[in-house]
Regions:
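Short, basic (Lys/Arg/His-rich) helix/loop patches that form interaction surfaces
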Residues: 104-154, 158-162
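Conserved tyrosine-mediated DNA breakage-rejoining catalytic core shared by Y-recombinases
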Residues: 16-62
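The alpha-helix within a helix-turn-helix
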Residues: 3, 14, 153
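Short, flexible/disordered intra-domain loops and linkers
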Residues: 40-42, 92-99, 138-146
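Short pre-functional
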Residues: 1-11
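Catalytic-site neighborhood detector that most strongly recognizes the C-terminal catalytic loop/helix
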Residues: 156-186
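Short, cationic motifs built from Arg/Lys/His that form the positively charged side of catalytic pockets
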Residues: 8-10, 50-54, 65, 71-72, ...
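Active-site/catalytic core of tyrosine-dependent DNA strand-transfer enzymes
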Residues: 57-118
């Protein structure tokens, strides 16, 4: 859910701690924690670029709170750290922060649950978030291209002025170019262009 709502990177998701969540303000902080001595994982998840604070809908905050209070806390050893996502499988790692390999297993199970999800990856949800963001911006005529770029870069954790958005925005740009080209051709066949 968080991958889709925020377009998070896997490392950002696995790096989340309960303390990063401010339920009073409805925000989630994405923080850099390189070489975290409190993280027991061999391959520690990292926040690749900029730290940021994301605003969350109250329904999403309720879901996170419900998970923490009614699900996560019941798992043995989960109270020994505050990483949000933990391992449920019984054994020596139960209650520990979820690893990259466990995360990929969870995504694989989700992918196999429906033929519609056959190509699902966490990173595709990041692309989906950017596509949906572009469509939402198109509906809001008050936001300039420059402001759109600034907002997108902040929300995605990119440095100001980053060109990375072009990679994530290809599908939306393709759809806009297709629509524009077809409108232009339609006008041509109607004889609406000036000679």
């Amino acid at each position: 859910l968080l991958l889709h709502c925020f377009g998070l990177r896997v490392g950002e998701l696995l790096n989340l701690r309960i303390g990063d969540i401010d339920f009073a303000e409805s925000t989630i902080a994405i923080r850099r924690r390189a070489n975290d001595k409190t993280d027991p994982r061999v391959y520690q998840p990292l926040v690749k670029t900029c730290e940021r604070k994301l605003i969350a809908d109250t329904k999403l905050m309720f879901e996170i709170s419900d998970y923490i209070l009614n699900d996560r806390r019941k798992i043995k050893n989960s109270n020994k750290h505050d990483f949000l996502f933990i391992t449920y499988k019984a054994g020596k790692t139960q209650g520990q922060p979820i690893s990259f390999s466990s995360y990929h297993k969870v995504v694989s199970v989700v992918r196999q649950s429906s033929s519609l999800l056959g190509g699902l990856t966490g990173h595709k949800l990041r692309h989906t978030w950017n596509y949906e963001f572009s469509k939402a911006i198109d509906k809001n005529q008050d936001i300039s291209d420059e402001k759109e770029q600034q907002i997108r870069s902040y929300l995605m954790g990119w440095r100001p002025g980053s060109e990375t958005s072009m990679i994530y925005n290809r599908r939306h740009i393709f759809e806009l170019s297709k629509k524009t080209a077809l409108e232009q051709q339609e006008q041509l066949f109607k004889g609406e262009f000036d000679e």
